[in-house]
Each structure stands twice: as structure tokens, then as C-alpha cells.
């Protein structure tokens, strides 16, 4: 199925609910005469614990939990741990942490797919006894060769085995008496079906492998298409909401629940298009490769699309939930622009982030007519959009730091910052200054900018109503500022479609996805903020303090590496919004 590129607009958010076809189906089901009339809407989120949740999972999370919330219903969290190869309790814990961080809760409805292994086995035996399943001895190669084609039925010489023989062989499989790959249990449906998922699919296979919860108790494991509908039915799920690739599996889902004697109602499976974002890969296999081959620092690298990576970068739960609401629910696969996600974060942080000043590429500014040793205190607002966030104090002295590009000895046209004998400029929250010159080293590099201040312009207001044409500049006091490391993140992939056909996604990596700046200057209160964050018990599971560095962007303390003695900030998102409105 082809994917369309999709740019959402603010108007999309307003109509997203009207486009949610899932809600329309549920409304029909719970209405008078519907199959779930009078019942509580009950959904589930069933992640496989073989990796960390990423932004692609968030759409399903918001749909599963959000739908239940909308109808005052229930949503289960079920670990789909029926494939033991790469499952681990590390991922189980991380998944629970990420879901709670997003603001969802499953109450006492936490389950494992492996909780149902005994029931899965019983229902498999029931199918055999009904003549609806058989043990097949085709090797994987033979299975593939005998699968048939469009208009050509599949073949299995074992399809008509007697029921008693199938029961005996399946018991041997369960008892570990059959080598791995020698036998499978297949559902007996229709070898000529146009839907290849219905051509007697494998529902059990042999794996001699340790399970993260069951150990070596089981050596046969149910396939997802068999276990999933049974688990849904046993948990009382009304609506099994899943991504679009399972649409062709729905006939098998329905076949399973209709042919085993589960004494509950039959769930309804509904599919929706999964989330794809440009400049990103969502495949767990590819993400694992990035981690294991050290293209990134770990699963929580801020360039990764994992929730722990996004959280470390400064993404908030509210911004991610707003993003999922904005893009809506549809049946057509599409690729969302990364700028849409950034827009949602920028909107959230604009309202919540405290403003502070930080200089990333510092050059010294000396106010030559300001007394040596003198210091003043100024009060600056924490957030101009929300006066209730209050103010904080900054100090001003003769020696300051400003951004290197806020001075130009030979200015380009329309340059409105500091230049010798140029325009007067405001130092944010303090005084008006005018550049008088600069100091250079032996190589001709500017090491110090010289200026004079207007003593009558305290707070940045010119005396006698004088109009100031220069820019307002951010700065920090060189006498008490803190040094910091600042990490500037960009897209991990320079190619918008690293998952595209005939591409090696590793060839699409962006060599400029991380720039590390040292010797940056930040306000002294940042040490206090970092010291408070150091006291947090679960630093990586929560958002670190986030700020708007005035004129620069939104930044957060790194929730893993930053300390009160070594400040590390991650750029969450730039100030400039590339989102198409």
C-alpha cells in the first residue's frame, strides 16, 4: 500500500475526532441492538517486550488508552511475550515506565501473554479434536515451496492425519521429544484461500529456548495470530485495535475466536494506519542495530525515536499526546513531517518553559564606563506568556559574555547588533550599550568587545524617549556565570525516507546530527536547578528541567549526564517553527 506525505495543520486538530472512524464503529457496537450493547468498552495495549517503546507506538497507546477513557471504559496492558527469542524484563520495566510517563494507567489489569500458555495449549488440543488442526512435518523450506500461489492451492501431505495421531504427535512436541523445526501445528482452514494467511497457518512451533518468565517449562510456543485473539477474548476485550498490517489477518482472528469454546463474547478487531515520521526509522531491528553497533550512545540517545530518547531530549508527555491527537486516526498510510512533532513540543514549552539567558559561543563584553567591582541586580520575567511563573534575579557587572555573532567589526547591510560606532543595543533586562571598539589577539581574532552604557537606561528603557534601532541582546555576567556543555541535536538521518526501497538506512545517517559545545555560559541559578534534579531517584524516567534560552532555543538538562558540577544541556527544539500552518 502506498504512503502519502501528510502535513497536518491546526485545523486538523479540530476535525480529528470527526475523522476517527474507530469511534463510529464503537458507537454502533454499544448502541441498542449492537453486539456490545450495555457492555463496558474494553481495549488493550499489547507491546512485545523485545525493545523500548518509540514514537510509533504512541499513536496506538493514545488510541487504545484514549478510546477507553472516552467511553469511561477499561484498557489492559498485556506483554506479548509469546516469542521468547529477544524478550527481557528490562524491556517490561521500561515499557511500564514510559506508559505511566505519558499519563496512562492500566490499574490492576496488567497481564502477560505467557499467562495464557496453558489455555492456549488447551484450545489447540480442542481444535485438533474438532479436526480443525493437524501436525505438519514440512520443513521450513518445504513449507515455503508448497505454499502455492494466486490460483494455485497450497499443499501438505499431512493434512488428513487421523485426529488421534495428531494428538499424540502434539503431545510429543509439548514434551520436548521432537527436534526444533521438525514439526508444527497448523490450523486446518483452506489451502486454496485467496488470503494466504488462511492457507492452514502455523499456530504452534517448537523452540528450545529459555523464556524470561516461564524458563524452560515450555518448548512449544503459540504464534501471535493464534494466541492474540484467545487472549483478547479471555480478558473480555470488546475492541481489539491494531495497526493496518493486521487487516488481512482479521479473518484468521475471527476464525480462531469462532472455533474455540471461549465462554465469553467475541472481540472485534479494528485496524488503523500506523504512524510514520520522516527522517526516522521505527523498526526495532534497525534501532537495535544503531545501538549495538554504536551509531548512537544507547536506546535513550536523544536522537532516537524511543520515548526514553525523546524524554531525554526534552519532549514532554503533553506534547506527544497533543501530536497524536493532531494527526488523527485514519486508514491510509502516511508519512508525517518531523516538524509537526517539533511544533507540538514548541507550543507546549512556549507556555511552560522558564526563560533564561545562555551564551553558546561566548566573547567577552567589557562595559568600559561601568565601575570596576560594582554589581547590580535586575529582575527578569520567567515567562512573558504567563506572569504567574514569576521572576528571577540576574546580576550585571563591568564584564559580561555575549554571543560572538552579536558583534561584527565590519557589518553587513541591515546588521543591527554591536559594531564599532554603530547602533545602540539593549542588553536584555539591563542597560542600553553602544560599541566603541574591540580587542584582537595576534591572529586577528576578536577576544573582547568594548562598549559604553547609558546609566539612565536601567531596565533597557532609553532616556528621554530616545528611539533605539539596535537589537536586544542576551548576555550573562562573567563574574558569576556557570560553564556548561551544550549538545545540539539534529535529525539522525539526513534522508527524509531512510526506510525507502533500495536504500541502506545506515547510508542515510546524518554526520551532523550531534554537535557538542563546551565552555558555554549560563546563569548561576542553573547550578541550583541541577542540584535539585540530582536528588531525583528516577532521573531517566522523568523530564529534566527545561528552559528557553532566549534567542537560541529550548533546552533541558540531560537527565543522565548532567550534574550540579558539570552542567549538560540538550537542545530540545529550536525557536524557529518550520511547521506549515
Stretches found by the model and what they are:
Residues 32-37, 66-74, 100-107, 130, ...:
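Secondary-structure transition/capping motifs at alpha-helix termini
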Residues 46-49, 78-86, 108-118, 141, ...:
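Conserved short loop/turn motifs at secondary-structure junctions
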Residues 77, 81-83, 89, 126-287, ...:
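Active-site cores that bind ATP or allylic diphosphates and position pyrophosphate for catalysis
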Residues 91-117, 123-124, 131-134:
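A glycine-rich helix N-cap at a beta->alpha junction
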